C-alpha cells in the first residue's frame, strides 16, 4: 500500500520493491489512496503490479486499473474472451473507462499547488490542536504523509464522544 487510507502515512514502496526483486518475488502494491494525491511513477516504484481505483480520485465507482510491468506473467480470471489482453472475458465498460481516464487526468492538474495548500492547512491545524491540548497524539509520522490526512488520538476521550462534540 503506497499510502495508508486511515492514518495517511506513505510507505517506502521502492525500498520494499527492491527487497522483493532481489529475492525474485513479484510485488504488487495498492496505490488507490495515493493516486491523485502523489505523483506516482510506476518505474520508480519498481512494482510489477500496481492497482488503482477510480472513485478514490473522483472517478466513477466500479472501475479500476491494474498497471502491469512488461514481462509480468498473469493468469486469466475468466476464460473465453480476448478482452483485457486475454485476461478477462466480457464487454468492457467503456463509459466507466472514459470516466476513469478523465478523472485521472484532472486529478493530476495543479497537484503540487493543491498538495502544498493542503499540507499547510493540515500542519496549521495540527499545531493549533497541540497548542490547545498537548495530550493529543498524532497517529503515524507527520512526514511522509498524505497532505490531506491528519489522524489523531485524544487520550481519555471516546471516539463517540469526540464525534458528538465535533457535530
Please place each PLM-identified region on the residue numbering.
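Pyridoxal 5′-phosphate
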Residues: 1-167
